[in-house]
From Swiss-Prot:
The gene is bchN. The lineage of its organism: Bacteria, Pseudomonadati, Chlorobiota, Chlorobiia, Chlorobiales. It catalyses: chlorophyllide a + oxidized 2[4Fe-4S]-[ferredoxin] + 2 ADP + 2 phosphate = protochlorophyllide a + reduced 2[4Fe-4S]-[ferredoxin] + 2 ATP + 2 H2O. This is Light-independent protochlorophyllide reductase subunit N. Pathway: Porphyrin-containing compound metabolism; bacteriochlorophyll biosynthesis (light-independent). It comes from Chlorobaculum tepidum (strain ATCC 49652 / DSM 12025 / NBRC 103806 / TLS) (Chlorobium tepidum). SUPFAM superfamilies: Helical backbone' metal receptor (SSF53807).
Length: 419
């Protein structure tokens, strides 16, 4: 479906203020319960994962870092055989994902050859490009799913089922499956599934329903290699997106449904939240690649979206979201310094931004929402509507409950020079 000519995308050239791709381990190791994620990286990678994911070593999580030391610089390839054997003894995984990071990529480590060398028939080792030089933290999920594609069975022609593409927790997955079955849509499974040996069969008559907005590459690959159809719709966030998503998906199976009443009831359920959002100026900086559907929900909830920026926009994959953002300033790969000037000039009521930039904004008196929270919470479909709305209004309510900022009180005894 062509993008509306009214939706203008401004392309800039700045770096992404985001976590690197290794952060995807945080939710994927919990989703794929018989997996292990091994990162070949430095002490920086190890500190990042332990602190960002809040895991202690004695908890024996199903991820780890094989540290590159100075001695490794003189070797042709890192020696990981002993590490792999230890992982197998301690965790007995069905699959091991070998993730790249910045330093070994600069060293030109042959990850594909290394993964092939370490693989066995019983426990394949799959290379996942996840370096922060190329990917932000949500895009690396796309890399993990692409690594799984060769292990998805071939579905025969004529077997028309939907496969939901994107990692969600088991409760959300059950909700999506139940909703589809109630609408008469046959479900083939999820990519990824909770176990490596339960990957869905995908073939020429499979309908791929992406439920995360950062998975364009794996959907394109399955369309190209398996001939699968890819649903082009809004993503199932908010009453508006959920209604359109299910109606469009049903239509691909020849089922006509009208979910207007259900969407209206969902809007009514979150009326206290949307009343608070109406008229509020909200600015979304680039971070998670979820910005387009989040901005669309805010717009339909009555907020004024000052700017919606994202690290990467695929005009085909995001076509429906872009059409729904008619009249909104949409920026790809935004220049953060330019954004700072616009934020100072427009003084938005709330900024949805990364953890890196959140505290400086707060220090300058702005209300901030961490964009990363939207990747970790259950905000999909009808069951996620209330959670999604609450995520946006919680910082507004928190600011209302706080006393007025009194600089002298905050600085008393801390900065004598300021007295």
């Amino acid at each position: 479906m062509p993008v509306s000519s009214d939706c203008q995308i401004l392309k800039e050239d700045n770096v992404t203020h985001s976590f690197c791709g290794l952060a995807c381990v945080g939710w994927l190791y919990q989703k794929i319960k018989d997996s292990f994620f091994l990162i070949l990286g430095t002490h920086t990678c190890a500190h990042f994962l332990q602190n960002a994911l809040g895991m202690m070593i004695f908890a024996k999580p199903r991820f780890g870092v094989a540290l590159i030391e100075e001695a490794d610089l003189s070797r042709a390839e890192p020696q990981l055989e002993a590490v792999i054997e230890e992982i197998k003894r301690d965790h007995n995984p069905s699959v091991i994902f070998l993730l790249s990071s910045c330093t070994p990529e600069v060293m030109k480590v042959d990850f594909k050859g290394l993964a092939h060398h370490l693989s066995t028939d019983k426990t394949p080792v799959l290379f996942v490009p996840a370096s922060g030089l190329v990917f932000n933290f949500t895009q690396a999920e796309d890399s993990v799913l692409q690594a799984l594609v060769p292990f998805c069975p071939e579905a025969p022609a004529g077997e028309k089922k939907v496969v939901f593409v994107g990692s969600v927790n088991d409760i959300t997955a059950d909700d999506l499956r139940t909703e589809a079955e109630q609408l008469g849509i046959p479900v083939g499974g999820f990519l990824p599934e909770s176990r490596f040996d339960k990957l869905p069969a995908i073939g020429p008559d499979t309908v791929l329903a992406p439920i995360q907005p950062y998975l364009s590459r794996v959907c394109s690959r399955l369309n190209r290699e398996r001939g699968s159809q890819v649903l082009t719709s809004l993503f199932p966030f908010g009453p508006d997106g959920t209604k359109t998503f299910w109606e469009d998906l049903a239509a691909m199976f020849g089922i006509k449904v009208d979910l207007s009443d259900r969407a209206e009831a969902a809007w009514e359920k979150i009326k206290p939240q949307t009343d608070l959002l109406k008229g509020k100026k909200i600015f979304l900086t680039a971070d998670t690649m979820m910005e387009l559907p989040l901005a669309r929900f805010l717009k339909n909830a009555g907020a004024e979206v000052v700017e919606c920026s994202s690290a990467y926009i695929n005009k085909k994959f995001h076509a429906r979201e872009l059409e729904a953002l008619e009249g909104v300033k949409v920026v790809e790969q935004p220049n953060f310094h330019r954004q700072l000037e616009e934020i100072r000039a427009t003084r938005p009521d709330m900024i949805v931004t990364s953890l890196m930039t959140a505290n400086p904004f707060v220090g300058n008196g702005f209300i901030v929402k961490w964009s990363m929270e939207f990747t970790l919470m259950s905000i999909h479909s009808w069951s996620g509507v209330f959670t999604l709305a609450n995520l946006f209004v919680s910082p507004l309510l928190r600011r209302e409950s706080l006393p007025e900022f009194d600089e002298s009180v905050w600085l008393e005894g801390v900065m004598p020079s300021a007295q």
